[in-house]
Amino acid sequence: METLDYRFDGTTHAHFPTNAVLVGVLASGNLEILLEPAALDGAMTVRIITAAQGFGSVWQAVITDFARRHPLRDVRISINDAGATPAVVSLRLDQAVETLLGGGTP
């Protein structure tokens, strides 16, 4: 298992209608993403736990792209990965934000 941690400055306030938002299913070739409110001085943190070791540069590119498109403030993102492709990761991250903005229902 490999753990990767990232931190980005956020500009967009996220209103959580529930305590957290969870999307995806941790299964072969997929991942689950949890968004939680957190006092992070306006930052967004991302922690990835993955079984696929050695893909740090790919993860960094995908997460940096997401942070540019969705610069959330005071949000902790936890990703549990079971070998998802970059396209699936981006899709699930966008789904998580859409769920958050849509009131918490996937």
UniProtKB/Swiss-Prot annotation:
Reported modifications of this chain: Covalently binds the prosthetic group of malonate decarboxylase.
Keyword Cytoplasm assigned: yes
Main subcellular location: cytoplasm
Keyword annotations of the record: Cytoplasm, Phosphoprotein
Pfam families in UniProt: ACP
Cross-referenced InterPro entries: Mal_deCO2ase/Cit_lyase_ACP (IPR023439), Malonate_deCO2ase_dsu (IPR009662)
One cellular-component annotation, GO: cytoplasm
Modification O-(phosphoribosyl dephospho-coenzyme A)serine occurs at: S28
One function term, GO molecular function aspect: acyl carrier activity
Subcellular location: Cytoplasm
The UniProt record lists the keyword Phosphoprotein: yes
Record-stated family: Belongs to the MdcC family.
Biological role stated in the UniProt entry: Subunit of malonate decarboxylase, it is an acyl carrier protein to which acetyl and malonyl thioester residues are bound via a 2'-(5''-phosphoribosyl)-3'-dephospho-CoA prosthetic group and turn over during the catalytic mechanism.
HAMAP family on file: Malonate_deCO2ase_dsu
NCBIfam families cross-referenced by the UniProt entry: malonate_delta
Protein name per UniProt: Malonate decarboxylase acyl carrier protein
Protein's organism: Stenotrophomonas maltophilia (strain R551-3)
Gene from which this protein is expressed: mdcC
